[in-house]
């Protein structure tokens, strides 16, 4: 029978730990081991004080030791948990932390009885039989739920076709506990690109049927046992274990923090993918303030996606199926909205992205309408809109399905083509489009950021890479991330020239030294569904921030070197 580990410190050990605390400033430390491996490196250990909304995590070193620095844990009773695929704690674990003394908590791990429940999306794709093309169908499923829901289902192919039809009618910011239906003729493009232009066709129907048959071959429709073995990823080692992660719980489990940024005052701002709020969190206390956004279209799904700051520090959000954009004046707390002209709207009108970062140049804010992949522009003073329409690849004549959009320093627009491997540059004055291609075919650029040198950094979702377009050289560099099926969603470059990206599939944050090509992958303590990524350059080392879109929390990762 497993013993509950309410951990105390003996008098002899206390003297040693007090000395270690004085030398290294340790609040809580211990060793993690298992009968199978002995000392275990790369185990993520999390401590959460009773009644707190903030959890702190560290990882074990090559000797299996973990250490929580003094100042990160207040005095009190803490529950401990671990993340190490293939293992569970041998009983409940807790520790009492006291001011001025280092507590010790050695943790014993045992093989898990349910490895399948611990697998990430990437590990499911690595484990399941099938071609890469078959598996890529699932890359549009992880925005609403993990693959656990799919692989644990008992649907046959015909039942999966019914599920597909039902899912196509849900708002992308839906979750199992908070579903929202689309309105009228609006339908989602399952397994496709950015825009609805790909639509329904005989070929597409055949592809959906093939996908349904494949999914029925890897789930539990044939019985309680799977025909394939599991392939978990290795735990982090070396530099990747040198981190501290802080996770802040948000006030409701239904909050979906899609985009997270940190302003010059150190406040954390986030968009809510499933509600009409702009959120602010004080990272010192975890206190959350919500600013309601007025509803524009009654009866339509609610939620916001892209969140950006303009030059005056105002916060903007794209209002998705509400058909507009909103701006929060942080000084007054007032929220102002602008609606897309009614004559341009359909049931599928969707403002997922807005780029106000260079509004100071000409007073214009770029806006993307996912319906038909249209590019629009708002004159903030007059409230007048321009519709630039949709664009085509000059080589293939196929529609450019922009996902992310980013204004450069001159307020020209970068368009990231989620249907192919294009980076478009639109000049609002001439309405001319310049197109550059990544060397990785069908890389599907998703989101990105313009740096101080006016270069565009972007994530290549299907390319499993990040790229950088240099407008001076008119060239693109690419870095493939080390773990298969990471599928980066976004990327940002820090003050040192390191590029940071995250995975919706692996729960790992990748740091790329763009000068040497060295890559470090940090494992987060919980399933995080990483989307928009942000780096706070005011700290040394820099701090990485992301919203846990499915976990109702905000996560900060601090590398220790």
Question: Where are these predicted regions, by residue range?
Answer:
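Beta-rich, blade/repeat-based domains predominating
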Residues: 253-265, 297-312, 343-362, 394-411, ...
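The canonical Cys-X-X-Cys-His
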Residues: 137-148
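Conserved beta-strand positions in repeat-built beta-propeller and related beta-rich domains
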Residues: 268-274, 315-321, 365-371, 413-419, ...
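A short, solvent-exposed loop/turn motif at the edges and junctions
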Residues: 51-53, 75-94
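Blade-level signature of beta-propeller repeat domains, shared across WD40, Kelch, NHL, RCC1
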Residues: 524-561
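Structural motif
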Residues: 25, 31-40, 73
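Short, acidic Ser/Thr/Gly-rich low-complexity loop/linker segments typical of extracellular
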Residues: 50-67
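Short Pro-Gly-centered beta-turn/loop motif in secreted/extracellular proteins
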Residues: 40-41, 67-77, 85
């Amino acid at each position: 029978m497993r013993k509950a580990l309410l951990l105390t410190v003996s008098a002899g050990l206390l003297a040693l730990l007090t000395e270690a605390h004085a030398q290294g400033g340790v609040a809580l430390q211990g060793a993690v081991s298992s009968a199978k491996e002995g000392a275990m490196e790369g185990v993520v250990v999390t401590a959460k004080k009773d009644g707190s909304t903030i959890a702190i995590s560290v990882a074990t070193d090559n000797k299996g030791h973990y250490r929580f620095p003094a100042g990160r844990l207040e005095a009190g009773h803490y529950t401990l948990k671990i993340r190490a695929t293939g293992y569970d704690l041998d009983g409940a674990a807790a520790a009492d932390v006291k001011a001025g003394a280092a507590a010790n908590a050695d943790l014993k791990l045992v093989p898990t009885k349910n490895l399948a429940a611990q697998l990430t999306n990437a590990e499911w794709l690595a484990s399941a039989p099938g071609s890469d093309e078959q598996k890529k169908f699932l890359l549009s499923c992880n925005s609403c739920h993990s693959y656990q829901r799919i692989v644990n289902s008992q649907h046959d192919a015909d039942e999966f076709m019914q599920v597909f039809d039902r899912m196509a009618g849900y708002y992308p910011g839906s979750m199992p506990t908070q579903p929202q239906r689309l309105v009228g003729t609006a339908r989602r493009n399952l397994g496709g690109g950015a825009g609805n232009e790909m639509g329904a066709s005989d070929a597409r129907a055949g592809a959906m049927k093939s996908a349904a048959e494949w999914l029925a071959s890897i789930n539990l429709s044939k019985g309680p046992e799977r025909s394939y073995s599991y392939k978990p990823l290795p735990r982090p080692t070396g530099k990747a274990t040198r981190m501290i992660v802080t996770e802040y719980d948000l006030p409701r489990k239904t909050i979906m923090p899609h985009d997270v940024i940190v302003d010059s005052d150190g406040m954390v701002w986030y968009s809510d993918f499933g509600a009409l709020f702009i959120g602010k969190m004080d990272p010192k206390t975890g206190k959350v303030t919500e600013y309601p956004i007025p509803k524009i279209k009654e009866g339509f799904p609610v939620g916001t996606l892209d969140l950006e700051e303009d030059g005056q520090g105002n916060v903007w959000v794209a209002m998705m199926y509400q058909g507009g954009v909103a701006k929060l004046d942080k000084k007054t707390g007032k929220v102002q909205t602008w609606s897309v002209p009614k004559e341009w709207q359909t049931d599928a009108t969707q403002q997922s992205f807005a780029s106000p970062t260079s509004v100071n140049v000409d007073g214009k804010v770029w806006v993307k309408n996912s319906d038909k992949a249209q590019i629009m522009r708002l004159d903030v003073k007059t409230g007048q809109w321009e519709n630039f329409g949709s664009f085509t690849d000059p080589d293939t004549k196929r529609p450019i399905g922009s996902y992310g959009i980013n204004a450069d320093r001159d307020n020209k627009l970068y368009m990231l083509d989620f249907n192919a491997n294009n980076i478009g540059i639109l000049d609002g004055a001439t309405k001319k489009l310049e197109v550059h291609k990544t060397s990785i075919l069908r890389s599907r650029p998703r989101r990105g950021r313009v740096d101080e040198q006016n270069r565009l950094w972007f994530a290549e979702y299907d390319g499993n890479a990040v790229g950088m377009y240099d407008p001076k050289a008119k060239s693109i560099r690419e870095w493939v991330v080390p773990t298969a099926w990471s599928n980066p969603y976004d990327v940002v470059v820090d003050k040192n020239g390191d590029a940071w990206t995250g995975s919706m599939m692996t729960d790992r944050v990748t740091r790329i030294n763009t000068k040497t090509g060295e890559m470090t992958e940090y494992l987060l303590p919980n399933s995080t569904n990483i989307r928009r990524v942000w780096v706070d350059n005011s700290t040394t080392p820099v701090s990485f921030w992301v919203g846990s879109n499915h976990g109702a929390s905000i996560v900060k990762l601090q590398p220790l070197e």
